[in-house]
């Protein structure tokens, strides 16, 4: 970073601009401790550069002002002086001013306005008073660089429509004058689009109902287009195509008011006059596209159905289906008319190409009919493709393929793939290797000759053609290959192609993959080709073969393809026996229940369960066989009043389940348990006798069992 003293000295005698601009940028340490006098000194030195008579110094000062405009303090203190000096420089520009200097000055003025716009106080004090002068100077210098100044005026129309209102008609007349000039056809497409888009934004300066002005302008353009299409009726028999007549009647006519477009003059004896017709159609279609694509600050209703009718009407005028009139007999005149029709079709395709990106799913109802019209644009020779015409009109075919891809991409699956057969064949035809016509004709003449050589020297170049014919092939341009790749990429992911066409597509993909193998050494594969290869693997169609090995050899580090090459399944779960888990759970439950049962057993032994036990009425000793029967669970369930047998049964169960039970210190219950289990009942009648004994209505009472007694 340069210190402030060095910057001031450099502004006095400028030599290199980059270090100065980098040191003055926003956030630089220079601004952290700059004083007020130093700031005034910096601004005055910069303004002195802009007042120099040397153009380089003025250009140097303009670029420094552009950097200083990011500083709020400088613009708040000296903004009015800076803007005034810039407007003086713009006023001094003339036809001898260099384009670099002029563009730098205009960009600096726009940057200063952008830095002020949005700040209420600065906008009120600096920008609003100077806006009329800025717009007026832009219109005054309009002839210096029309396309550039129109692009710079568009933001002022959107941001300041009220201030721009007095200049709206003047700008509109200048734009229309440029559009209707003969030189407009030589402008690049980007410049043409700028003029058309800016003209559509002028509707925002209307004081009342700008949306109505927008709609009326659009319908007037559509009516003018309909009138222009009827001129082709002077050369072609529209009466032979009833559908075309219906289409033209559905398109609204222009109003009876005076049109902004002058009438066309076409002389049948002057072939060059025919090209004014497609030029007028191109202007109208570009203007319609500008009205549809340019952003507006108001809500506008778009007649999408009429727009679709306009495109359909232009594409339906085709000399393949509509014959020429008898008056048109000259073959050269017919060929010129065919060429003008193709130019008109190209303009309509330009409008059709942008519609999917604007209206999306609203175009789906018109998609099938549009694709049918696009298929008719492919040159045919009887029932087969005219490959020579397809190759000769390579750019037009690429535009058709782009429109097809844009419309098919609106849906996730397109069912009617039979209508795409011609389009696929045409796409494959323009990417095939070609040989020049001169070499092919020379080769044919050589083969048809009788072997007589007039001169030995004449056969030298022909020998190269015969032995190394591949060196004379014309390579397909990269742009054409990209168009076809994009078209194929959309088709294989949205439609199931017929077997023959799918094989052609796969062959094309494999050839492109092999051609791209040299990119492996460079480490990069084009993104579009990468997507095409991946989609070709993901959508194999009805074929049993796969190009996965070839694609994997090229895209080795692709994560998606690595899943197909080395499938990674989820980790295998270990099988666990449920029985073991249940046994462990039972053991845990038993271990938790053992202390409780031990406490219950201790209470039973010590006679502490007085609350749960039912005291018997008598203390008679029960016979031995009766005591054994009480331990059976079935007998216990019969008498709900007796709870003592249930307690003894649970105690027995808890003790018998343990292999080596740990006896409590004062627990002496195991002895009566062993005595009760000593005799075994093997007869089934024992259980029956037990039930009969319990069901007997005798006066037998349950004696109290004294577990504390010592049998020994």
From Swiss-Prot:
Compartment(s) of residence: Nucleus
Annotated segments matching region Disordered: 435-456, 575-712
Predominant place of localization: nucleus
Biased composition (Acidic residues): 579-603, 694-712
Pfam hit, one: RIX1
Keywords: Nucleus, Ribosome biogenesis, rRNA processing
GO biological process: one example: rRNA processing
Start-end of Basic and acidic residues biased regions: 609-625
Compositional bias per record (Polar residues), positions renumbered to this chain: 643-659
Gene Ontology cellular component terms for the protein in this record: nucleus
Lineage top rank: taxon: Eukaryota
Cross-referenced InterPro entries: ARM-type_fold, RIX1_N
Comp. bias regions, Low complexity: 435-450
Assembly with partners or alone: Component of the RIX1 complex, composed of IPI1, RIX1/IPI2 and IPI3 in a 1:2:2 stoichiometry. The complex interacts (via RIX1) with MDN1 (via its hexameric AAA ATPase ring) and the pre-60S ribosome particles.
Family: Belongs to the RIX1/PELP1 family.
Protein task: Component of the RIX1 complex required for processing of ITS2 sequences from 35S pre-rRNA and the nucleoplasmic transit of the pre-60S ribosomal subunits. Regulates pre-60S association of the critical remodeling factor MDN1.
Official protein name in the record: Pre-rRNA-processing protein RIX1
Organism listed in the record: Meyerozyma guilliermondii (strain ATCC 6260 / CBS 566 / DSM 6381 / JCM 1539 / NBRC 10279 / NRRL Y-324)
Gene from which the chain derives: RIX1
């Amino acid at each position: 970073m340069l210190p402030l003293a060095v910057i001031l000295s450099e502004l006095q005698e400028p030599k290199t601009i980059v270090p100065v601009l980098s040191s003055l940028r926003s956030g630089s340490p220079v601004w952290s401790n700059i004083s007020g006098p130093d700031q005034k000194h910096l601004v005055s030195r910069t303004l002195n550069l802009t007042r120099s008579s040397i153009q380089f110094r003025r250009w140097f000062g303009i670029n420094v002002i552009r950097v200083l405009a990011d500083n709020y303090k400088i613009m708040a203190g000296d903004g009015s002086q800076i803007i005034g000096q810039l407007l003086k420089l713009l006023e001094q520009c003339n036809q001898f001013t260099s384009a670099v200097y002029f563009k730098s000055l205009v960009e600096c003025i726009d940057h200063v306005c952008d830095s002020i716009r949005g700040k209420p106080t600065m906008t009120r004090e600096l920008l609003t008073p100077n806006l009329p002068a800025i717009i007026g100077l832009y219109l005054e210098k309009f002839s210096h660089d029309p396309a550039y100044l129109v692009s710079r005026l568009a933001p002022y129309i959107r941001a300041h429509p009220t201030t721009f209102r007095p200049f709206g008609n003047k700008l509109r007349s200048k734009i229309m004058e440029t559009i209707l000039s003969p030189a407009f056809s030589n402008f690049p497409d980007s410049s043409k689009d700028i003029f058309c888009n800016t003209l559509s934004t002028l509707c925002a300066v209307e004081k009342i109902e700008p949306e109505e002005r927008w709609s009326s302008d659009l319908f007037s353009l559509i009516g003018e287009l309909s009138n222009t299409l009827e001129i082709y009726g002077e050369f072609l028999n529209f009466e032979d195509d009833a559908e075309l007549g219906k289409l033209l009647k559905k398109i609204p006519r222009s109003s009876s008011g005076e049109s902004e477009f002058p009438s066309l003059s076409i002389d049948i004896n002057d072939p060059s006059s025919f090209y004014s017709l497609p030029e007028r159609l191109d202007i109208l279609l570009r203007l319609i596209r500008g009205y549809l694509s340019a952003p507006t600050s108001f809500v506008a209703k778009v007649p999408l159905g009429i727009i679709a009718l306009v495109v359909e009407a232009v594409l339906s005028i085709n000399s393949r289906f509509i014959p020429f009139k008898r008056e048109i007999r000259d073959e050269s005149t017919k060929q010129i008319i065919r060429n003008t029709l193709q130019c008109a079709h190209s303009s309509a395709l330009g409008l059709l190409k942008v519609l999917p990106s604007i209206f999306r799913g609203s175009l789906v109802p018109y998609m099938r009919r549009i694709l049918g019209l696009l298929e008719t644009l492919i040159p045919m020779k009887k029932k087969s493709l005219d490959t020579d015409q397809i190759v000769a009109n390579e750019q037009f075919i690429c535009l058709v393929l782009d429109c097809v891809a844009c419309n098919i991409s609106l849906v996730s699956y397109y069912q009617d793939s039979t209508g795409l057969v011609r389009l696929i064949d045409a796409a494959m035809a323009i990417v095939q290797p070609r040989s020049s016509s001169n070499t092919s004709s020379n080769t044919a003449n050589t083969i048809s000759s009788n072997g007589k050589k007039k001169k030995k020297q004449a056969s030298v170049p022909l020998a190269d053609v015969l032995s190394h014919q591949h060196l004379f092939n014309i390579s397909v341009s990269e742009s054409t290959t990209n168009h076809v790749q994009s078209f194929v990429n959309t088709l294989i992911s949205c439609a199931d192609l017929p077997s023959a066409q799918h094989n052609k597509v796969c062959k094309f993909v494999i050839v492109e993959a092999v051609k791209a193998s040299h990119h492996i050494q460079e480490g990069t594969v084009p993104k579009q080709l990468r997507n095409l290869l991946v989609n070709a693997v993901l959508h194999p169609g009805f074929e049993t073969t796969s190009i996965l090995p070839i694609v994997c050899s090229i895209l080795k580090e692709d994560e998606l393809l690595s899943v197909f090459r080395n499938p990674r399944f989820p980790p295998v779960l270990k099988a666990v026996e449920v029985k073991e888990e249940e046994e462990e759970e039972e053991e845990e439950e038993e271990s938790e229940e053992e202390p409780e049962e031990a406490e219950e057993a201790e209470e039973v032994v010590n006679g502490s369960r007085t609350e749960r036990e039912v005291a018997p009425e008598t203390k008679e000793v029960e016979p031995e066989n009766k005591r054994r029967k009480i331990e059976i669970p079935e007998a216990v369930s019969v008498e709900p009043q007796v709870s003592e047998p249930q307690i003894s049964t649970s105690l027995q169960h808890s003790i018998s389940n343990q292999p080596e039970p740990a006896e409590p210190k004062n627990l002496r219950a195991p002895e009566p348990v062993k005595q009760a289990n000593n005799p075994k009942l093997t007869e089934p009648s024992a259980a029956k006798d037990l039930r009969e004994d319990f069901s007997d209505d005798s006066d037998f009472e349950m004696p109290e069992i004294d577990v504390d007694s010592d049998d020994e």
